[in-house]
C-alpha cells in the first residue's frame, strides 16, 4: 500500500496555467470538431437531396413542365432547364461549403495532434485525451 502511495506521489505533475490553457483549448477544439462533423453530415444530406432532385427532373419527359423551386419561404415556378441550372448552382455552392468545413476540421485536427503531443509529453498516462466511443 505504501509503495503505491509513493508511486502515485512520484507521478504527480504540477499543472501550470499554460498547461490548463492547453487542456481547455484541446477540449474546445474537440467540441468544435464534433459540431463541424455534424454540420458536414447535414450538408451532405442536403447535397444528396439536390442530386436526387436533379435526377428526377432529368427523368421528366415534358419540356414544357413548370417546376416549383423554393427560394427562401416561397416557391417560384421555372422551366425544366432553368430549374436544372439552379439546382446545379446550389449543388456547387453546397459542395464548396462542405469542402470549407472539411478543411476547417483538418486544420483543427492538426492543432489537436500538436496539443496531444505536448500534453502527453508532460503528463504521460496521467491524462486521457482520447475521445469516448460511446
Curated annotation (Swiss-Prot):
GO terms for biological process: protein folding. The modification Phosphoserine is found at residue 125. It is found in: Nucleus; Cytoplasm; Mitochondrion. It comes from the Eukaryota. GO terms for molecular function: unfolded protein binding. Belongs to the prefoldin subunit beta family. Heterohexamer of two PFD-alpha type and four PFD-beta type subunits. Interacts with URI1; the interaction is phosphorylation-dependent and occurs in a growth-dependent manner. This is Prefoldin subunit 4.
Amino acid at each position: 500500500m505504501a509503495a503505491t502511495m509513493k508511486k502515485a506521489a512520484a507521478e504527480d505533475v504540477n499543472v501550470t496555467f499554460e498547461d490548463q490553457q492547453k487542456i481547455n483549448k484541446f477540449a474546445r477544439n474537440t467540441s468544435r470538431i464534433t459540431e463541424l462533423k455534424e454540420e458536414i453530415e447535414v450538408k451532405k444530406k442536403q447535397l444528396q437531396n439536390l442530386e436526387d432532385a436533379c435526377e428526377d427532373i432529368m427523368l421528366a419527359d415534358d419540356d414544357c413542365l413548370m417546376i416549383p423551386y423554393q427560394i427562401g419561404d416561397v416557391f417560384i415556378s421555372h422551366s425544366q432547364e432553368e430549374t436544372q441550372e439552379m439546382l446545379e448552382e446550389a449543388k456547387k455552392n453546397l459542395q464548396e461549403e462542405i469542402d470549407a468545413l472539411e478543411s476547417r476540421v483538418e486544420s483543427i485536427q492538426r492543432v489537436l495532434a500538436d496539443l496531444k503531443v505536448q500534453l502527453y509529453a508532460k503528463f504521460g498516462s496521467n491524462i486521457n485525451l482520447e475521445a469516448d466511443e460511446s
